């Protein structure tokens, strides 16, 4: 039926969050985070992001800068199994004895992720800022398409064959489907703010962050009848998207002897992205026009950055031994997403972090840490083009004091994701049962240089 063909078309014209891999805010902007994970109570230069109020307690007046380079490598995988039609009986279409099975793997690589931090301290006042890619999924490719492409196309082609002037049974073994999707998504952020040391133990921060979104995707689907040039379902998409939004940020830091407590709140960012659609090919029907209307050139789609709360505490047990614990809450459920997708979340995202560092010598510090991420996922939220998985991360690394002005940080973070299984009795609108198992991998390496003068 035409609806299934239109579903296939719409799956190519995916939402703006496709290649972000679901709910994503990049907190790993500095190698110090990778090596320890809990940095929400730091008073070092990476605090420009993680604890800006804490920069009022920088050890000396003057300029403090940090440059970080990271390399991130991910895969997003879908193990799909779904039924297909294979013929017609007196009672209607018949279903194949065995499901169609295929493993879809999407590599995503960001070999160079730069971040720049800076602060100037003078007495009780500190002005600070940073530039970084604070959200987005980098670049990604599904070279073999997606299950939703294949399932909708197979069912749609079968139904259309039966409705032809001369009804024909067209089964998946009679044609070859080729499909692919390439995408990119980045949110570049520039933050500026001011910290004030109100008392010997208390400081506050206020500032703002400008966010610029840039992304795009290209995709196609062809279903060529074997031995011919006949294309049963030509689909194509070439679209870029841009947008911007402002994030107010406030923070507070309390330094109580060996205990330091840092807190930060980032308000929700209202962000709309605008389509710059260069090419769309789809079935030219009234239904098709209605379905692709939100994705035409010039149309805006919500892509809010959720409000975020961070609370952390660090304690110096010994002059050479320090530890930190931290909590993050992302209010994803109240952040606008394409098609109101946020309403399918059961809750916001909770993160629990902890880290420890030990000074082996005056020049060398070793550290490690862990993070647990708990999303409020549901079957209606998860899709082939945008899915998340609960996870835990481990980080390890070192800090090297080169001299009294220069410190180097090196860190490695590995994330283990919990598979998410989604079963459906109406797989991608085909009317047939199917199952997807979503999984991910993630590895990040980083090197940072911090300089004070």
Listing of model-derived features with the role each one plays in the protein:
Residues 1-20:
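Gram-negative bacterial Sec-dependent N-terminal signal peptides
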Residues 2, 86, 428-432:
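Low-complexity, polar-biased intrinsically disordered regions enriched in Pro/Ser/Thr/Gly
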Residues 10, 69-71, 412-414:
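A broadly conserved detector of short glycine/acidic/proline-rich loop/turn motifs that flank catalytic sites
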Residues 11-12, 89-92, 253-256:
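Short stretches within intrinsically disordered, low-complexity N-terminal or propeptide regions
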Residues 12-13, 61, 360:
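Alpha-helical transmembrane segments and their juxtamembrane interfaces
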Residues 16-133, 387:
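N-terminal, post-signal peptide beta-strand-biased segments of exported outer-membrane/organellar beta-barrel
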Residues 21-38, 42-43, 113-115, 119-453:
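Outer-membrane beta-barrel porins/channels
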């Amino acid at each position: 039926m035409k609806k299934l063909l239109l579903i296939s078309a719409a799956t190519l014209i995916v939402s703006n969050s496709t290649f972000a891999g679901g709910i994503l805010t990049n907190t790993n902007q500095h190698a110090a985070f990778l090596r320890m994970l809990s940095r929400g109570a730091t008073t070092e230069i990476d605090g420009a992001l993680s604890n800006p109020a804490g920069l009022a307690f920088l050890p000396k007046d003057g300029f403090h800068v940090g440059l970080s380079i990271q390399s991130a490598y991910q895969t997003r995988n879908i193990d799909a199994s779904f039924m297909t039609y294979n013929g017609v009986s007196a009672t209607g279409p018949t279903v194949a004895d065995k499901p169609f099975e295929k493993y879809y793997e999407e590599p995503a690589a960001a070999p160079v992720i730069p971040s720049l931090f800076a602060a100037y301290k003078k007495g009780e006042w500190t002005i600070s800022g940073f530039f970084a890619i604070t959200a987005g999924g980098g670049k990604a490719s599904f070279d073999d398409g997606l299950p939703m492409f294949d399932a909708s196309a197979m069912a749609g082609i079968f139904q259309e064959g039966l409705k032809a002037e001369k009804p024909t049974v067209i089964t998946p073994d009679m044609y070859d489907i080729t499909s692919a999707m390439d995408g990119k998504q980045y949110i570049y952020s520039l933050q500026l703010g001011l910290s004030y040391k109100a008392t010997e133990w208390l400081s506050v921060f206020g500032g703002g962050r400008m966010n610029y979104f840039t992304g795009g995707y290209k995709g196609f689907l062809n279903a060529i009848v074997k031995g011919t040039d006949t294309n049963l379902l030509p689909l194509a998409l070439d679209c870029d998207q841009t947008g911007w939004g402002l994030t107010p940020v406030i923070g507070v830091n309390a330094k109580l002897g060996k205990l330091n407590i840092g807190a930060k709140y980032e308000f929700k960012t209202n962000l709309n992205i605008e389509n710059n659609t260069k090419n769309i090919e789809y079935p030219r029907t009234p239904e098709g026009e209605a379905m692709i209307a939100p994705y035409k050139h010039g149309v805006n789609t919500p892509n809010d950055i959720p409000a975020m709360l961070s609370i952390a505490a660090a304690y110096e047990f010994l002059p050479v031994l320090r530890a930190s614990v931290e909590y993050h809450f992302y209010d994803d459920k109240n952040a606008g997403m394409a098609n109101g997708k946020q309403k399918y979340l059961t809750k916001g995202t909770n993160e629990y972090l902890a880290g420890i560092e030990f000074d082996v010598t005056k020049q060398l510090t070793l550290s490690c840490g862990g993070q647990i991420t708990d999303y409020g996922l549901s079957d209606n939220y998860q899709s082939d083009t945008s899915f998340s998985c609960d996870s835990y991360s481990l980080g390890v690394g070192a800090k090297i004091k080169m001299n009294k002005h220069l410190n180097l940080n090196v860190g490695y973070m590995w994330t283990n994701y919990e598979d998410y299984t989604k079963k459906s009795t109406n797989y991608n609108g085909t009317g047939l049962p199917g199952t997807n198992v979503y999984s991910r991998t993630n590895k990040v390496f980083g090197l940072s240089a911090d300089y004070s003068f």
